[in-house]
């Protein structure tokens, strides 16, 4: 039987009596997930369709092609996109950590920035993204969609209504959006 044992700073995954994964949070190692950094491309690896980014951590982060926003594309993509046509070594990029460093692997990075607020998630460089949390269904979903349509948001940004947005007025959501836009 697989189980997950969680303590304040330790997570252990066990199968029967066998430990198969252990993650210990140490006070010396700060969490980087969701942090946003200005990084520099150090190496482009066409075979992996990815780039390695120096963002200030001891290991360089991994940035796959699918996680690169269209704002970094020099020209509109025609057919299959080659990462060398999108990025160049030494180029500066704004990245967000999606997955922490683990073992000998660097952090997984994205250029699709997301800023989580109390009721909304703002995606400043992803205008096509947005909607309602997947956990919300039925009539509540329709009500939130109407509230979302009533928000005054920049056209080049995406928004997602979080589960905490349930039962909130358009004014409360607009306040949250205005706060996120100031960041």
Can you name each region flagged by the protein language model?
Residues 1-183:
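Single-stranded RNA-binding surfaces
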């Amino acid at each position: 039987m697989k189980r997950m044992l969680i303590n304040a700073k330790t997570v252990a995954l066990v199968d029967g009596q066998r430990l198969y994964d252990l993650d210990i949070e140490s006070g010396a190692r700060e969490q980087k997930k969701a942090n946003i950094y200005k990084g520099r491309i150090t190496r482009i690896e066409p075979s992996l369709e990815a780039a390695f980014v120096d963002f200030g951590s001891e290991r360089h982060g991994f940035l796959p092609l699918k996680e690169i926003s269209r704002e970094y594309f020099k020209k509109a993509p025609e057919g299959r996109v080659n990462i060398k046509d999108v990025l160049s070594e030494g180029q500066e990029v704004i990245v967000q950590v999606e997955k922490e460093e683990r073992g000998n692997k660097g952090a997984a990075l994205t250029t699709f920035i997301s800023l989580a607020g109390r009721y909304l998630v703002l995606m400043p460089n992803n205008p096509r993204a947005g909607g309602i949390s997947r956990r919300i269904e039925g009539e509540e979903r329709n009500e939130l969609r109407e509230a979302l349509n009533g928000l005054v948001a920049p056209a080049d940004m995406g928004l997602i209504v979080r589960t905490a947005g349930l039962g909130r007025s358009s004014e409360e959501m607009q306040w949250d959006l205005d706060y996120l836009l100031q960041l």
